[in-house]
Amino acid sequence: MRCPFCGHEDTQVKDSRPHEDGAAIRRRRICAACSQRFTTIERVQLRDLYVVKADDRRVPFERDKLARSVRIALRKRPVDEERIERIVNGLVRQLEASGETDIPSRDIGKLVMGTLREVDIVAYIRFASVHWDFRETKDFAAILQSIPGTADGDVPVVPGDAAAAIAAESGPGGVKRR
């Protein structure tokens, strides 16, 4: 494997361990030329997957892009990095197990939304707002209506403590609650 620091092709594996519940192998390597140490992670790839975009373009599936999207949706939420990796691994396994090599992007989005809905409802709404390209507040209202316990004013648009804090910051009038 090529050294990411100097580009030399001769690196040695110093340590290998199971990673991500055995779904991958973590290897510590050292470069023979510059002596820098680095880590690689190897995963099994059952088949090459392709994403079919809305305009019918076919692009290679990128696990890192999926992971980045999930991380963005879960940013500042109470979900640790290890759980995010398990979520992404599970999503990739489901895609590979589907038996399809060409997967529509909308199907990947639905799969991610279904998983995020079970993990964190805020992350689900964040992801859905990008996936479905929300343009107006009514788009958010519609998705909130689909969530049990949020219909017909059961839950304020801004939860109580947050609404009070925002009202205190915004001065007279504050934030109107639904």
UniProtKB/Swiss-Prot annotation:
**Cell division among keywords:** no
Q: Where is the ATP-cone domain?
A: 49-139
Q: Name one GO biological process term.
A: negative regulation of DNA-templated transcription
Q: Which residue ranges have biased composition labelled Basic and acidic residues?
A: 7-21
Which Pfam families does the record cross-reference, listed alphabetically?
ATP-cone, Zn_ribbon_NrdR
Family from the record: Belongs to the NrdR family.
What's this protein's name?
Answer: Transcriptional repressor NrdR
Q: Which organism is it from?
A: Gluconacetobacter diazotrophicus (strain ATCC 49037 / DSM 5601 / CCUG 37298 / CIP 103539 / LMG 7603 / PAl5)
Q: What is the lineage of its organism?
A: Bacteria, Pseudomonadati, Pseudomonadota, Alphaproteobacteria, Acetobacterales
Encoding gene, per UniProt annotation = nrdR
